[in-house]
Regions:
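Amphipathic alpha-helical "coupling" segments that flank catalytic cores
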Residues: 1-690
Length: 690
């Protein structure tokens, strides 16, 4: 038998950003706790709105599963006398376990026979277990910035104001923060009232009658469709912005979308100047025409019904107008000062107390960008554009617009540089040097943006590690992981195969040139290189490469992301070929035996058997070709060439014993195997695949 179970935690308005994590936590914790309680159920769902967090368990068993438990008793010699009759020890053990002495059985433990009893433990009624389950579940939820209220010691997202707990039509009684659980929930703060539930199945329908759509998935889809319909009325559409849609969804309980107008005088502003206040500050959805350009409309969503919608629309329009008026003023004021004139002011802006000013950082970016441009083989005119980009990259931090809208850094710099007549490559580079800004963002497309972006991120990472700032667990306040992923991702696109080891060294030296004291390079280099290695692994795994393939490649080198990516892809492809198993076996056997080499010099002339001499001669022909192909990063062809050695290696193992008594011959054979490992290892350390 089973019944539906409902637990609702009603509270004051919870920040929208708390909602996704709360849902995940509540669902995971509830599943784990129900499993530990041996309570079966059909389905489990968590609902969330700003004012409630609800667990709904469908067809929860009315009773725990019965279990059988084996208990170990005294040894056989103590449990039975010489005649095989149970002793007092056996009788007492049986009584203590609640079984008949005849039901005891023997079983060996560490070679000694003991008596055992199999106990049948009946499950408890679910109704008795649920009060503690509710209390434990509520207490298990954590939030980024929880609150305390009243005289209570507990913390929660926001003060809890009511509790509902129903198992079928029965209230599950418990008390928490001075509140008693019951069957009464609350509807919309202004449109709904108190809602009395007789059973969990009524929950969604009863709340919707009180102007609350509790199912966040349905609420989100309702918003999506309303927005789409309103934008279509003016011949437009709204960009797919799941983050904004999710945030809006978690800000309200009963969505009603409305279409607002933007004063056309603001439409001459740069697009981002219009959309940023809309999206970031007001949570409005900008409307675009079929050509992709902004239309003078926006869609917003109110938390309520359609009552007085025109009044609400006018209020939203006024708020946006004030925002855009400020933005227009800042934009006009910023245009009065050429972007290059702002660069000296960066000397007065502190980047980090131990890493100097932003002005000093700009000088570091120029020097590091110049080195990267050299490594990439850029032409002199391209290098000049890179230097100009690095010089102006941070200048917009001084502007009014970026001060008020920090998310526009780089974007406004590009607009201002363009208005000053800077080359398009410089403008694009200023905008792109912050990319990728977030997971899944594009990499810079322009060479200026790419070079300065690599320099910018390397400077941030090396500087942070140099003053003891490293990501720990989920904490990464300087977004160093994202920046490292950006560096690695961009280097994987560069055919020049740049070295992280060299770039880290260059960045460190530039800090030293400015007399900025960092931890010794030899102290931080291992952590830095391992940090980048993990980012390389992550990116390639995201691209579908197996962990053992990456183990094989990264065991060989973790310095050059471009060649690592090429080598890993080649290994993954070669692994599928019919002859790869033989290749792998040959490599592993050579590698394992060659570890026994003493390291002493050996002479090919000491090789005696025709099979080993033939292998050595063939190796002399093939090894240079394999090295040449590997140096050119043509790993597939390198593998094809190296694979020619496999039949000869197999013949060698059939014909001779490697570990012979004669020292010079043994050394020569082990040396030969070492050379084979070097050539066959063109795809990585293949012992990682064995």
């Amino acid at each position: 038998m089973s019944k539906d179970f409902l637990l609702e935690i009603g509270m004051e308005e919870m920040p929208a950003k708390f909602a996704p994590g709360a849902v995940t936590q509540m669902e995971n914790n509830a599943r784990k706790m129900l499993q530990e309680l041996r309570l079966e159920y059909k389905n489990l769902k968590v609902y969330v709105t700003p004012r409630r967090l609800c667990l709904y368990v469908q067809e929860l068993a009315e009773k725990q599963q019965d279990i059988k438990e084996e208990a170990k008793g005294p040894a056989k010699k103590a449990a039975y006398d010489a005649d095989g009759q149970p002793t007092k020890a056996a009788v007492g053990f049986a009584r203590g376990q609640g079984v008949a002495v005849e039901d005891l059985y023997l079983k060996e433990f560490n070679g000694v026979p003991y008596v055992y009893a199999l106990k049948q433990l009946p499950g408890e009624d679910t109704e008795k277990l649920l009060p503690k389950f509710c209390l434990d579940l509520i207490a298990s939820l954590n939030f980024p910035k929880p609150m305390r209220w009243g005289h209570y010691e507990v913390r929660f997202a926001r003060p809890i104001r009511w509790l509902v707990a129903l198992f079928g039509d029965q209230i599950i009684p418990f008390s928490y923060v001075g509140l008693q659980s019951g069957r009464t929930t609350q509807g919309h703060r202004t449109l709904g009232g108190y809602v009395r539930l007789t059973k969990p199945a009524e929950y969604l329908e009863a709340l919707e009658a009180a102007y609350v759509i509790a199912d966040q998935d349905r609420r989100k889809e309702t918003i999506r469709q309303q927005i789409k319909a309103l934008a279509a009325k003016v011949g437009g559409y709204v960009d797919e912005d799941e983050d904004l849609l999710t945030e809006v969804n978690n800000l309200l309980e009963y969505p009603t979308a409305l279409l607002g107008e933007v004063d056309v005088k603001y439409m001459i502003l740069p697009e981002e100047v219009i959309t940023t206040p809309m999206k970031e500050h007001q949570r409005y959805f900008p409307v675009r025409g079929e050509d992709g350009k902004l239309l003078p409309y926006f869609v917003t969503v109110r938390n309520g019904d359609s009552t007085s919608l025109d009044l609400v629309k006018e209020g939203n329009k006024k708020v946006l107008k004030a925002r855009l008026e400020d933005a227009a003023f800042y934009y006009r004021e910023d245009l009065k000062k050429p972007l290059p004139s702002l660069v000296p002011q960066l000397d007065r802006v502190v980047y980090h107390e131990k890493l100097g000013t932003v002005g000093q950082r700009v000088e570091r970016l120029r020097k590091l960008s110049a080195l990267i441009a050299d490594y990439l083989g850029l032409k002199s005119e391209q290098k000049e554009l890179v230097d100009r980009t690095a010089l102006l990259a941070k200048a917009d931090l001084i502007t009014h617009m970026v001060y008020d809208f920090p998310e526009l850094q780089g974007i406004m710099g590009a607009y201002y540089a363009g208005s000053n007549g800077e080359p398009s490559e410089v403008c694009q580079g200023i905008m792109e040097h912050y990319m990728p800004r977030f997971a899944g963002d594009d990499f810079p497309r322009c060479f200026t943006g790419k070079v300065v972006s690599i320099a910018d991120k390397l400077d941030a990472i090396v500087g942070a590690f140099g003053v003891g700032i490293q990501p720990t667990g989920s904490q990464d306040p300087y977004a160093l992981r994202r920046q490292a992923l950006g560096v690695v991702g961009m280097l994987m696109q560069e055919e020049k195969d740049l070295s992280l080891h060299v770039l880290i060294q260059d960045s460190y030296r530039i800090f030293a040139d400015q007399k900025i004291t960092l931890e010794p390079l030899e102290k931080i280099r291992p952590a830095l290189e391992d940090f980048f290695k993990q980012r390389i692994r992550y990116l390639l795994q995201e691209n579908g490469l197996r962990y053992d393939v990456l183990d094989a490649v990264l065991a060989q080198q973790a310095d050059r992301p471009y060649s690592i990516a090429g080598q890993a892809k080649a290994l993954a492809a070669c692994r599928k070929e019919a002859g790869f198993i033989s290749y792998l076996n040959a490599y592993v056997r050579c590698a394992n035996l060659s570890k026994k080499a003493s390291g002493a010099p050996w002479a090919p002339s000491d090789l005696a058997d025709p099979t080993e001499i033939e292998l050595w001669n063939k190796l002399q022909q093939i090894a240079p070709v394999v090295k040449s192909k590997t140096d050119k990063l043509d790993f597939l062809e390198a593998y094809t060439q190296a694979a020619q050695l496999v039949p000869d290696i197999e013949k060698l193992f059939e014909a001779v014993m490697i570990m012979v008594e004669e020292e010079s011959l043994r050394a020569a054979r082990l040396g030969l195997l070492q050379e084979c490992v070097k050539t066959l290892g063109c795809l990585g350390d293949l012992t990682q695949l064995a």
